[in-house]
């Protein structure tokens, strides 16, 4: 039988409302007590494992059309949470601020999508008139231009 301590080591962490920060704080605190991966390669392995588990839940949720959707939504949420938590651990290992990384990627996505919109408008079309393949080609052009 497992007996829980009244006061967890993790309960000492302050709440700042930032979920990415909380994940990193939880992992950092656990690491102080030896609960950590010894190398970043193992974090990548764990991330691949978590992605595989998420993929498995996606397949199961699509196969079981007649059963409780709430159950599968909860499973998908749980597995996606594991992937995100692992990504925060990777950010900690790489010493990268995940908020800054995500903000940078959001900005990059906006620049590239704006390029696609301009590209499509120059052809006198609407974005929904192009296939995904055509949109991907425009995306690749945006990348080539350093956007």
Locations of regions flagged by a protein language model:
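Flexible "arm" and connector segments at domain edges
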Residues: 1-80, 85-147
